[in-house]
Curated annotation (Swiss-Prot):
Quaternary assembly: Part of the 50S ribosomal subunit.
Family matches, as Pfam families: Ribosomal_L4
Signal sequence extent: none
Organism placement in taxonomy: Bacteria, Pseudomonadati, Pseudomonadota, Gammaproteobacteria, Vibrionales
Role: One of the primary rRNA binding proteins, this protein initially binds near the 5'-end of the 23S rRNA. It is important during the early stages of 50S assembly. It makes multiple contacts with different domains of the 23S rRNA in the assembled 50S subunit and ribosome.
Name of this protein: Large ribosomal subunit protein uL4
Length: 200
């Protein structure tokens, strides 16, 4: 299949990478796994045995007319422990290579189908100026976009850093979450070739 390239000849790409059916279940699973992996998992609460104090019985067992109590750190008491206290845990989920590649191909194919993938011959700015990048995006009529280049472009990355809903990355920096987070994805022709090799 062929992808239209702005300002250059059409680019021939593999149908298995840019023309496959959308596997919603797989994409969902991989995106959820990425979100889970981003969780810190450091939340910690104290159980009744961990809360400081509560060693002495507050009052005697019988004869006071009050409900019996053995410790002031019981979960039903104010300042007591938490019944099912949250503990630090690892939320990460396993995503094997085949699943990851399948999800990436599904997302890229869907971007092509929805005409959200824009391929350009070259995309760069002369200086790390946000103003320059804004002008370039205006030419393409874009306000919400991920720009993917074949290699690290310091000027472009710095220019994009201060823009809302605009991000710039090299091929090594893209993942399923970044591809679906933006309205449009702008890729250089060289980046498309690299993505194809990476997912082959």
């Amino acid at each position: 299949m062929e992808l239209m390239v702005k300002g250059a000849d059409a680019l021939t790409v593999s149908e298995t990478t840019f023309g496959r059916e959308f596997n919603e279940a797989l994409v969902h699973q991989v995106v959820v796994a990425y979100a889970a992996g981003a969780r810190q998992g450091t939340r910690a609460q104290k159980t009744r045995s961990e809360v400081s104090g509560g060693g002495a019985k507050p009052w005697r067992q019988k004869g006071t007319g009050r409900a019996r109590a053995g410790t002031i750190r019981s979960p039903i008491w104010r300042t007591g422990g938490v019944t099912f206290a949250a503990k630090p845990q690892d939320h990460s989920q396993k995503v094997n290579k085949k699943m990851y590649r399948g999800a990436m191909k599904s997302i890229l194919s869907e971007l092509v189908r929805q005409e959200r993938l824009i391929v350009v011959d070259n995309f760069s700015v002369e200086a790390p100026k946000t103003k320059e990048l804004v002008a370039k995006l205006k030419e393409l009529e874009l306000t919400d976009a991920l720009i993917v280049t074949s290699e690290v472009d310091e000027n472009l990355f710095l220019a994009a850093r201060n823009l809302y809903k605009v991000d710039a990355r090299d091929v090594a920096g893209i993942d399923p979450v970044s591809l679906i987070a933006f309205d449009k994805v702008v890729m250089t022709a060289e980046a498309v070739k690299q993505v194809e090799e990476m997912l082959a």
